[in-house]
Every structure is written in C-alpha cells, then in structure tokens.
Amino acid sequence: MIHTNLKKKFSLFILVFLLFAVICVWKKGSDYEALTLQAKEFQMPKSQEKVAMGSASQVVFSNSKQDPKEDIPILSYHRVTAKVKPQPSFQVWDKDSTYSKLNPRLLKIWRNYLNMNKYKVSYKGPGPGVKFSVEALRCHLRDHVNVSMIEATDFPFNTTEWEGYLPKENFRTKVGPWQRCAVVSSAGSLKNSQLGREIDNHDAVLRFNGAPTDNFQQDVGSKTTIRLMNSQLVTTEKRFLKDSLYTEGILIVWDPSVYHADIPKWYQKPDYNFFETYKSYRRLNPSQPFYILKPQMPWELWDIIQEISADLIQPNPPSSGMLGIIIMMTLCDQVDIYEFLPSKRKTDVCYYHQKFFDSACTMGAYHPLLFEKNMVKHLNEGTDEDIYLFGKATLSGFRNIRC
C-alpha cells in the first residue's frame, strides 16, 4: 500500500516537471519569434539598400536608444556625403609655359632674335614676371594699350600727298560696339573642326591676312566683319588688289616700327613700304573701309607681355593674332578665340588652307607667341574642356569692366 502511494506521487512529480518544461520551452520560442519580428521591422530590404548605397547622401545607423516613455527602440543617424566624382582633366596649354618647351631649333632662333634686336628694343619697365590677377591684367591692358588708327590729322598723312586716301569715318564710329565676337585664327587645327556655324553665330568675326572662307565654311564659317593684315601681305601679295577676298569686311593693316617710334619716324622707315599699294587699293575701292593701325600699339602690347613673362621674350612685335584679340576686346563685351590655344586637333600644319608644316606656328619663332598664349590662357574665363574640344578661349572685353 505504501509502495503504491509513493509510485503515484513520483508519477505526479514527473508529470508536473514535464508540464513546467513544456511551458518554459513555449515561452522561450515566443520571445525568440518576437525578437525576430522586431529585427525584421528595422531591417532595410536589399533592393532599398542598394539604392541608398548608390545615392549621393547615405543614412548611417548608430546604436539604438530606448525611449523612456515607450518601450520602442529609437534609431539615431547622421548624414554622410559621398565623395564627389572628380571632374575629368584636359591636357591644354599651360599658362606658365617657358622656353624649356621649345625644341633645340626654336631655342636657337629665340637666342638669335635676342642678339639681333632688329627693332632696337630697350625695355625699362617692371618685371619680368610681374603677377596680375585676371581682373587687374584686363584693366592694365585697357589702360596702357591704345587701339587707334592713323587719321588725316596725323603728320605726314595730313599733307596733300595723302589727301582723300584715308577713310573719312572714324574707326570707332564705324565698328561696334558688339556683344559677342569671334577671333578666328588661321591654324591648321581648324580643319575638320565643324565650328563654322558656331563662329557665324557671333555678332562680329575677325580673320587674319589671306585666310579664306570659301570651301572651308563648315570649319571656319563664312562671316567676315574685320580682316587684320600685316604689311608684308599687302606689299607682296600679287592678288591683293584683285582678289574679292580683300573686299569683304573692314580692312586693317599694321606695320611694325622701331621700338616706340612716333608716326613720322616710322613713316620714314617702315618694315614693309606698303603705302603705294594702299593708295592703289583705295583708288580701286574708294568705298571699302581700309584703316592703318598706329605703330605705337603693338609695342604698348609687347611691353605688357614682357612685364608679365618670366623669361626674356623675343624683341619683335606681337603676332597678328594677339593684336586682333586686343582689337576685339576694345570693341566687344565677350571675345571667343578659336584655335589660338591649340585643341586636341593640335598639329604642325600652320594653316587650315595650306599644307605648310612648322612647329613655330604653334610655339613661336619670330613673334613671342608662346608668351602671348600664356597671357590668353591666364585671361581665359572659359573651361579647359572648351579649349581641349574646340580650341576655344573666352575673354571679357574692356567696355564694361570696372577698374
């Protein structure tokens, strides 16, 4: 009897123990499930995670905190800005270029011109290597480079020998002012550029010497507002008096004088004696505007190029290209210059209309072209991408600047 009662008590104890164990296991499973569901509630789906990782601004979660009022975890976060992808760099003209870029042949030519000093240059101004901001240099050019033409009141052009030959209308009243202007170089890199339409969309277009537009309109356009020519072309070009190329737009001829010579002294000894050809042209085309640039202007510009350049530059006048840029800066609010600074199409072919090869056409030999390009690159307000793709530099004109 006693043995039977003990057996029943033992069985009841086992039953209670098993029941307690089952209840504990069930409760633990419920807690685990609740925790799993809670974790899932705050888990970012993989698709959303990928979107967030690819966005410019990512949300980064830190340790969760408990709200004392409600037993709900609060996730604190802060924003992390992703690194901006760097802009692509373009290999374009370096505004700090020096003669170290020249090949041995051009370096020898430079030394020869320094020794020759044909124009008796004796520069006594500041520099070399004076640093200007873009704004200060623009003001410096405006205030010290006088773009003006020979007038009938200038001796000896006021004598009977010249009566009736010079244009009656003042140059500044004949041209401009314009908003957007284009200066189109004659560089071989303009070939296959497809820039013609863009160039023609400007209010005025300046071209140089005998650079044609016929058969090249797709690359260089067809509009010609001003044509700047050197005295060598006017004197030696046999077609000058007959070719219709030289009857379109306003013509300007320039001839270098001895360093800072006045008009009478220059007239006695011009670099090229173009005066008789000029008179012949005016007799044939009396209504064609044809101006003569005062000889002081190129040397006023040369002084500034030397002032800001780290090296001694050739003691020769600036190129027609640089003169044309300054002329248009006096007449226009904005000047777009094409292939003065070379693009990705850079070539040793000198002209888009001729097959003549020489690296001097890009780097300079007679003219201080390398340092002219340095100055234009410094003044450029466009992008390196524009230079690389289109050979296009954009400069502000002088008319609206405050100095």
Swiss-Prot record:
Signal peptide: none annotated. The modification Phosphotyrosine is found at residue 366. The chain crosses the membrane at residues 10-26. Substrate binds at residues 186, 209, 230, 319-321, 350-351, 362, 366, 373. It is found in: Golgi apparatus, Golgi stack membrane; Secreted. CDD domains: GT29_ST6GAL1. InterPro entries: Glyco_trans_29, GT29-like_sf, Sialyl_trans. Pathway: Protein modification; protein glycosylation. Changing residue 208 to A: Reduced KM/kcat values for CMP-Neu5Ac, no effect on kinetic constants for beta-Gal1,4-GlcNAc. GO terms for biological process: N-acetylneuraminate metabolic process; negative regulation of chemotaxis; negative regulation of macrophage apoptotic process; positive regulation of mononuclear cell proliferation; protein glycosylation; protein N-linked glycosylation via asparagine; regulation of substrate adhesion-dependent cell spreading; response to ethanol. Keywords: Disulfide bond, Glycoprotein, Glycosyltransferase, Golgi apparatus, Membrane, Phosphoprotein, Secreted, Signal-anchor, Transferase, Transmembrane, Transmembrane helix. Its EC number is 2.4.3.1. Gene3D superfamilies: Glycosyl transferase family 29 (3.90.1480.20). Glycans are attached at residues 146, 158. Pfam families: Glyco_transf_29. Residues 1-9 are cytoplasmic. The soluble form derives from the membrane form by proteolytic processing. Disulfide bonds join 139-403, 181-332, 350-361. Changing residue 366 to A: Loss of catalytic activity. The keyword Metal-binding does not apply. Expressed in hepatocytes (at protein level). Strongly expressed in liver, spleen, lung, kidney and submaxillary gland and weakly in heart and brain. Homodimer. Monomer in its soluble form. This is Beta-galactoside alpha-2,6-sialyltransferase 1. The gene is St6gal1.
